[in-house]
């Protein structure tokens, strides 16, 4: 049943409201998680394919993304949103995450999200590398990267690197499919290989010529999911 229902839910842990999309109707549910500066509807081609296979999909706009309010967000809020959605809509058969959404899915699994398998597409890996790359693109001085890390650790406690994807991968027991494009300019394909190296059960699929976003609509990649 191809019907999309939009709702708002409160994520109590972060005291923010997010917009959520239910697509289809089934007892078998899949959670879809968009990436940085993305929105829930970005994964629509994947949702269409899953619908044909009898799954219902739940996607959402993270705080400050898509139709959700706010002017800033960080991965901790993505993870809190995933865990709140599981409470209200779970259990999910599996989870699919793109880019920062892939990192968030692995971290949510580390924090006890219960899924039978996960798919991560164009996922980032080491947080300090991502920050350093961002600082470089903005042509800021490298010490800003250290300041950002110190600010994060002072505010949230613990080490920032604990949220890196490879660290979450080490704690992940379920099978994970890692999909990444060789020509991804936003996130190097090295991230995929390093994440896979730290997973206990994994498959890797490397595409070519699709970059960071087109991969979400690629038939071959979608068929593998």
Locate predicted features.
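Alpha/beta-hydrolase active-site loop
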Residues: 72-93
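Conserved alpha/beta-hydrolase
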Residues: 40, 47-69
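Gly/Ala-rich beta-loop-alpha elbow adjacent to hydrolase catalytic centers
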Residues: 96-105
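Short alpha-helix in the alpha/beta-hydrolase fold that links the catalytic acid
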Residues: 165, 174, 188-197
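Short beta-strand/loop motif that positions the catalytic acidic residue
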Residues: 171-173, 178-180, 184
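Hydrolase active-site cap/lid region
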Residues: 110-158
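Catalytic histidine-centered segment of alpha/beta-hydrolase-like enzymes
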Residues: 210-220
